[in-house]
UniProtKB/Swiss-Prot annotation:
SUPFAM superfamilies listed in its UniProt record: Adenine nucleotide alpha hydrolases-like, Argininosuccinate synthetase, C-terminal domain
Name of the protein described by the UniProt record: Argininosuccinate synthase
Pathway connected to this protein: Amino-acid biosynthesis; L-arginine biosynthesis; L-arginine from L-ornithine and carbamoyl phosphate: step 2/3
GO cellular component terms attached to this protein's record: cytoplasm
């Protein structure tokens, strides 16, 4: 007598934060699809609850398995560092705080799906934000056969319904004291949106900030020296640091001076404009220092072209194309351009600003004897006349024609 084979139950890997929406999503997905849910929480320095507490909550909410990953160093080394080397500021202002964390999380979601034989990955994004694209474009780039679902978008899991579901199932998660804001944070920065900020005339209030102190409050300035090797921050005030430690220390020191506050209306990937408030003290301090060291060490034509590459790199990352061939190719160029970005940058952190006050580098292209206007100037000014004649020749020829 042959035994009947037990049908294989489909499995869904869920990007789990430990909050109400993703806790409810565990049971919601199970009811809507009949699948078993595996919860995966990834620590990218967002702070908050202990990872083991989050893991146990996922199991209590119905996950058949729950995994947590401490990815802080990975996030800093493999995602934040390339952004620093690229001086990445979307629309010249936003240091890609959320956009950088999504591919980190995606990598762990895909690994969990492959480990547990899941066919689908789920996330908690809405249908009008950038993150749904970042998650799903990243997932299919790493595992083209995986399907993606978003309960809020695909199954109309509104917050009211989520609260009712939570109370009905008696899930171990609070349903009160909901912030009026949508907040996303990691070690590279913090993003705040919605609530009264949706009226773009309303000024942000101090209560929304956590990573930065009020820059208007009087306090003594803080001087810091950041050392780089090939574009990588390797020391602060002469003490060796990892990339993660550099970000964390500058978050604390620059944040205490109110550095890194950004209030902007940005162009979202989905076609709308959105008002966002960011705090990124460590990111802004590092990018400011790195840019200045590049000014000292990178040849002019390379520096000019790199600025174009930086903008495109930032757009690709913002648009969820972290794993794209173009982004990888541009990163190769950026790494090459950073080969001689070595040295120290001295900065004063005060009043919401990170101001560079000193630069030194063994690979500097700054030649004092060529730059000085004092005695000892080695610049051959006699060569300037002939250079100008040749440089302006094409304009001179065109002017003769156009003004005739």
């Amino acid at each position: 007598m042959q035994c009947e084979e037990k049908p294989v139950t489909e499995r869904v890997v869920l990007a789990y934060s430990g909050g109400l929406d993703t806790s409810v999503a565990i049971g919601w997905i199970a009811e809507e699809t009949g699948a078993e849910v595996i919860a995966v929480a990834v620590d990218v320095g967002q702070g908050g609850e202990d990872l083991d507490v989050i893991r146990k909550r996922a199991l209590a909410c119905g996950a058949v398995e729950a995994e947590v990953a401490d990815a802080k160093d990975e996030f800093a080394d493999e995602y934040c560092l390339p952004a620093v080397k690229a001086n990445a500021l979307y629309m010249d202002r936003y240091p890609l705080v959320s956009a950088l964390s999504r591919p980190t999380i995606v990598k762990h979601l895909v690994a969990a799906a492959q480990k547990h034989g899941a066919t689908t990955v789920a996330h908690g994004c809405t249908g009008k934000g950038n993150d749904q694209v970042r998650f799903e474009a990243g997932i299919v780039a790493l595992a083209p056969g995986l399907k993606c679902i978003a309960p809020v978008r695909d199954y109309a899991m509104t917050r009211d319904k989520a609260i009712a579901f939570c109370e009905e199932k008696r899930l171990p998660i609070a349903t009160t004291k909901k912030s009026p804001y949508s907040i996303d944070q990691n070690v590279f920065g913090r993003a705040v949106e919605t609530g009264f900020l949706e009226d773009i005339w309303n000024a942000p209030i101090e209560d929304i900030y956590e990573y930065t102190s009020n820059p208007a409050e009087p306090r003594e300035a803080d001087e810091v020296v950041i050392s780089f090797k090939e574009g990588v921050p390797v020391a602060i005030d002469g003490r060796p640091v990892t990339v993660l430690q550099a970000i964390q220390q500058l978050n604390e020191r620059a944040g205490a001076q109110g550095v890194g506050r950004i209030d902007m209306v940005e162009d979202r990937l989905v076609g709308i404009k959105s008002r966002e408030v960011y705090e990124a003290p460590g990111a802004i301090a590092l990018i400011t220092a790195h840019q200045e060291l590049e000014n000292v060490t990178v040849e002019r034509e390379l520096a000019r072209y790199k600025r174009q590459v930086e903008q495109r790199w930032g757009e690709l990352v913002y648009d969820g194309q972290w794993f794209s061939p173009l982004k990888r190719a541009l990163e190769g160029f950026i790494d090459e351009a950073n080969q001689h970005v070595n040295g120290d940058i001295r900065m004063t952190l005060h009043g919401g600003r990170a101001v560079v006050t000193g630069r030194r580098s063994e690979t500097s292209l700054y030649d004092f004897n060529l730059a000085t206007y004092d005695t000892g100037d080695s610049f051959d000014q006699a060569a300037a006349k002939g250079f100008i004649d040749i440089y302006s020749l094409s304009s001179k020829i065109a002017a003769k024609r156009d003004l005739a």
